[in-house]
A protein has these predicted regions:
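Terminal amphipathic alpha-helical/low-complexity segments used for targeting or macromolecular assembly
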Residues: 1-72, 114-118, 141, 181-197
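Glycine-centered loop/turn positions within well-structured domains
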Residues: 94, 166, 174-176, 184
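Sequence/structural signature of small/polar-enriched beta-strand/turn repeats
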Residues: 54, 72, 76, 96, ...
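Conserved short histidine dyad/triad with adjacent acidic residue
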Residues: 59, 81-82
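Short-chain dehydrogenase/reductase
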Residues: 143, 161, 177-179
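Short acidic capping loops at alpha-helix termini that bridge into adjacent secondary structure
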Residues: 78-79, 100, 140, 158-159, ...
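Flexible, glycine/small-residue-enriched loop-and-beta-strand segment within the central core
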Residues: 65-67, 84-155, 181-182, 187-196
């Protein structure tokens, strides 16, 4: 197999000690690096000063925080609640999908990348491992409890509830309650009996 020639920009980034994967950045141009840096700073500003600003606290978080997430690239449905101090993977915000009427409560983390440990062996440098990316899908009407962390590649089904301080590493089925580190389903949400009034 013929190996692609790496761009001059990528080789310079490597010389500076920046560890980017060859697959994603091997052919990157200087212009793309500049655009990405500008976007990173813009997104950081939006997240820092608009998501949790006391100056903007009189503005409804129901409107402002979902708007900020949309601006940085997340796909956010209607009537979504985003709590205080929610952190998203701003470098990969385009991999985050939040359904209508979802609630992501205070302090939650949505992480779309992590180190790929599949080829990690004794003596290897963990900092040089490539990243594995994965989409996060939060279904319609879900509630994510405070300080929970959602890992890459996870789908949380419609109407599911994730308990506070949970670490979600695998998919959560629709209409279930999951909690723990790692999160496990502890209850199936029952159907409403039509004869009850």
């Amino acid at each position: 197999m013929e190996k692609k020639k790496l761009s001059l920009t990528f080789r310079m980034l490597r010389l500076l000690g920046l560890n980017y994967s060859e697959e994603e950045y091997g052919q990157v141009s200087l212009w793309n690096v500049i655009k990405r840096v500008v976007k990173t700073y813009r997104d950081g500003f939006l997240l820092k000063y608009m998501m949790n600003s006391w100056l903007l606290s009189p503005i409804s978080p129901r409107k402002l925080r979902p708007w900020v997430l949309r601006k940085i690239g997340c796909k956010v449905g209607k009537d979504v609640f985003i709590g205080d101090s929610v952190k998203v993977d701003s470098g990969h915000a385009d991999l985050i999908y939040i359904g209508d009427h979802a609630h992501i409560t205070g302090g939650c983390r949505l992480l779309c990348h992590q180190r790929d440990l599949s080829n990690y062996y004794v003596g290897d440098d963990a900092a040089k491992l490539p990243y594995r990316l994965g989409e996060i899908h939060i279904g319609k009407g879900c509630m994510i409890g405070m300080e929970s962390m959602i890992m890459p590649g996870v789908t949380i089904g419609e109407g599911a509830i994730v308990g506070a301080f949970s670490l979600v590493t695998k998919d959560i089925p629709a209409w279930t309650i999951a909690t723990g580190r790692p999160a496990k389903v502890v209850k199936q949400i029952p159907q409403r009996d039509n004869q009850e009034s």
